[in-house]
Amino acid sequence: DVLTPATEISLDAARKISKHAQLGDLVNVDVKTQAFGRIAAQTAKQVIIQGIREAERGMVFDAFASKEHEILTATVLRILPDTGDMIVRIGGGSDKTDAMLAASEQVHGERYKEGDIVRVYVVEVRRSTRGPQIIVSRTHPGLVKRLFELEVPEIASGAVEVKSIAREAGSRTKIAVHATEENVDPVGACVGPRGGRVGAVVDELHGEKMDIVVWSEDPEKFIASALSPADVVSVTVLPGLTK
């Protein structure tokens, strides 16, 4: 019996097309394209184009989803005069795509023009009906953390851990670090020989001041350390309060 007329025909009908047809065989049927109307052909074309676009968007999303919380090199394509938002191109080859570096995610005082190269931090990659949205930033604390991970081998290996970061982008950043191995100076590791490691981070951030302090489980010690370079006489944590 024919259960699905759209894809099945009876054995008698099949043998009119191919006299050797058997049950379960596939039979090729010629379709006269002249029978299709102009609207049907246009609809088929749109469906195919839409499928290709969705496949391309999926490929772009897959390419950049793994790059969340990474630093990528971008090229400034244009700057929107009304808002100051920048359209930048990230990636290369078939994986390149455009992203927006919003004015709120730009560091005050940094100036760019079309064609400039800028390193951006990928905050998030989202799916949307218009394709993947890639949120990038120059002000996110994650940019500082990732720069130190790239410059300091002890952080990359896990011997030094970044516990917290407080950032006023373009002005000053405080980064609290902790050694997970004995005989490792976490601050010294981040500063590097002759200040080379922290200097590379500062250069990338266009002179942003960088305070590196030792993290401690003891709130009083940590607060005193975090207040450097100020001279702290004493710190008292009030019982039952968070200050």
Question: Over which residues does each language-model region extend?
Answer:
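RNA-contacting regions in translation and RNA-metabolism proteins
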Residues: D1-K243
